[in-house]
């Protein structure tokens, strides 16, 4: 199982936290008693939740011990639990969450057709499911990863690393999953808000883009390679990124980063 490097992830903390804040800004809950940060990472999103819902029980869920260790140091007042999102449910005796907040995490989990309705059904009546997912698998950053991974010198080691991250569904499918009839009796959406944004991040260089991706998307491609081949992969990747992202008027590169946002509220 992959583990993550919190320090590498947080090199671009402002850029990573911005969509988390914009997702939270659209959550229509003035108060909450129990908030779950599903895929909390190093706690940058959890901090936003704790600031907005002071006094609430905040539970962070992640499958990375390294990320959880950083989150616990940063927010000792919150609860953090090692768990797999694919099978997570509230602990026995725990109150149903008023907010399940999943920022940049569900793209690593498959079978959204069943996952999303299951998470929605875990909410307390009137509760909110808030999701943000990168939608960049067809961007040059990710196409280039797969192209290089298919080269013979890398393919034997990388295998199916391109499948580690789930394909997200068409936007309308998420709307239908939440706005339509639910399997569990008594679970019905009162409102579903879905939108798509393409961020344009100014990056200092092609190397900076590579460093961003090393914190997330590149990891399953590079981690299984011998050390010498890791360097070869990253060199080839940077060369192709350099060719794909032209220099702008100020000498920087614009990194296009599409993201999908979903906010769905259960009827009381």
Swiss-Prot record:
Catalytic activity: trans-aconitate + S-adenosyl-L-methionine = (E)-3-(methoxycarbonyl)pent-2-enedioate + S-adenosyl-L-homocysteine
UniProt GO molecular function: trans-aconitate 2-methyltransferase activity
GO CC term (a single one): cytoplasm
Keywords: Cytoplasm, Methyltransferase, S-adenosyl-L-methionine, Transferase
InterPro entries in UniProt: Methyltransf_25 (IPR041698), SAM-dependent_MTases_sf (IPR029063), Trans-aconitate_MeTrfase (IPR023506), Trans_acon_MeTrfase_C (IPR023149)
Known EC number: 2.1.1.144
Any one of the GO BP annotations: methylation
First-tier enzyme category under EC: transferase
Compartments where found: Cytoplasm
Domain of life: Bacteria
PANTHER family: TRANS-ACONITATE 2-METHYLTRANSFERASE (PTHR43861:SF1), TRANS-ACONITATE 2-METHYLTRANSFERASE-RELATED (PTHR43861)
Similarity comment: Belongs to the methyltransferase superfamily. Tam family.
Functional note: Catalyzes the S-adenosylmethionine monomethyl esterification of trans-aconitate.
Name this polypeptide is given: Trans-aconitate 2-methyltransferase
């Amino acid at each position: 199982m992959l583990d993550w490097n919190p320090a590498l992830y947080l090199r671009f903390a402002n850029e990573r936290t911005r969509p988390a804040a914009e997702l939270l800004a659209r959550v229509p809950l003035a108060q909450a008693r129990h908030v779950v940060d599903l895929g909390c990472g190093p706690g940058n999103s959890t901090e936003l939740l704790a600031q907005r819902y002071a006094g609430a029980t905040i539970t962070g869920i992640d499958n990375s011990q390294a990320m959880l260790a950083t989150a616990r140091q940063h927010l000792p007042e919150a609860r953090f639990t090692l768990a797999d999102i694919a099978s997570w449910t509230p602990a026995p005796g725990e109150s149903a969450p008023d907010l399940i907040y999943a920022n940049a995490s569900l793209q690593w989990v498959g079978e959204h057709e069943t996952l999303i309705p299951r998470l929605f059904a875990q909410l307390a009546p009137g509760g909110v499911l808030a999701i943000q997912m990168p939608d960049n698998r067809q961007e040059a950053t990710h196409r280039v990863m797969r192209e290089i991974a298919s080269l013979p010198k890398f393919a034997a080691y990388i295998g199916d690393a391109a499948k580690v991250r789930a394909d997200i569904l068409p936007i309308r499918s998420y709307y239908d999953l939440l706005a339509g009839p639910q399997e569990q009796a008594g679970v019905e959406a009162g409102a579903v808000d879905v939108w798509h944004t393409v961020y344009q991040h100014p990056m200092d260089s092609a190397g900076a883009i590579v460093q961003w991706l090393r914190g997330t998307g590149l990891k399953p491609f590079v981690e299984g390679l011998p050390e010498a081949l890791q360097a070869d992969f990253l060199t080839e990747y940077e060369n192709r990124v350099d060719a794909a992202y032209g220099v702008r008027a100020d000498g920087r590169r614009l990194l296009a980063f599409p993201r999908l946002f979903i906010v769905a509220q259960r009827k009381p």
